[in-house]
């Protein structure tokens, strides 16, 4: 999903994307993020903000330049509501990072 444009993310906030169809399975996810100080973490959770954690993306200090970050996904198939839950990894709790877009990637095993 392009152009989310979520800025000034605080610890514990989340974004809900309803009805994402992962088909027979997604193996990884890309996310475009930027941070100026400590960054943080994005938890990819299914169906509720504290549901199954399908993956986790660490967002480092990118010197405020957007970077594409990738992580593996587990047990991520079918249709789900997806929660991107934002967490602090330092004493900083406000304005952790910016989140521009995300894209799930299907497994390439057996595909041509």
Where are these regions (language model features)?
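Extracytoplasmic
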Residues: 1-112
């Amino acid at each position: 999903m392009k152009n989310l444009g979520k800025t000034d993310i605080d610890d514990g906030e989340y974004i809900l994307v309803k009805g994402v169809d992962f088909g027979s399975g997604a193996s990884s996810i890309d996310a475009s993020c930027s941070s100026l100080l400590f960054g943080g973490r994005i938890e990819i959770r299914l169906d509720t903000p504290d549901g199954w954690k399908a993956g986790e993306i660490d967002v480092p200090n990118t010197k405020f330049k957007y970077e594409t970050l990738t992580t593996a996904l587990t047990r991520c198939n079918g249709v789900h509501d997806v929660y991107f839950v934002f967490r602090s990894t330092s004493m900083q709790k406000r304005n952790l990072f910016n989140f521009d877009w995300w894209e799930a990637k299907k497994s390439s095993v057996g595909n041509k």
